[in-house]
Amino acid sequence: MMRKIIGKIINIVLPPKGQEQASKEAPPPTTEVKAVSLEQLLGGALGDAPAEPDLRVIGLYSSVEDEKIAELTQALLYLNEMNRLLPEGKEKKPVEFYINTYGGSADDMFAMYDVMKQVMEETEIHTIGVGKVMSAGTLLLAAGTKGKRKIGRNCRVMIHNVAAGNFGNLPNLTNELEAIQRLQEDYISAMVENTKFTRKKLEKLLNEKVNIYLDADEAVKYGLADEIM
């Protein structure tokens, strides 16, 4: 009995005769490496290759501050460069820009605004306001490609004057006030350029109220967006 058990164990552990020699002579397995073509990188735009998912969506779901604006700037410039690589005659693809923010820095707002205007010389930016679009976020919503700006039915919009919180001696405060006044003028000019507000109407509203709240219908009425989703 013991011999039969040992024999079975040996048969299980040891390979059949001839198999060991064959495995030594067999060539090593090869690894197939597949290159990613330019067509795939461009979502199949340059040929008939199956398109990879073409994600051209960016989003601002935080404060308007330098680190986030740096990320969005890099993304916009990259997506615009991808459009430049398309062959002549191919339709350029837009970028969808979702905005949901309480606002933030006026300087960073203008940094993003200027980049958007530069990119839109070649690539459409479809802005989409959801949730809340307030303070510095309102200009970014309005700055999208005209006719392609959307807003959620339940989105809240809020506009107010440029604010600052620096303190110091009188000369510093005077200097700071002059800078804020210039920034305020630039903000009003940009809003008038990108919305249906007249300068007189916007200045009147800003002087009457600390915060101006608009619902989706009012945002479309005043030209911050073109349609409600």
Feature names for model-found ranges:
Residues 1-229:
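Terminal-region recognition feature
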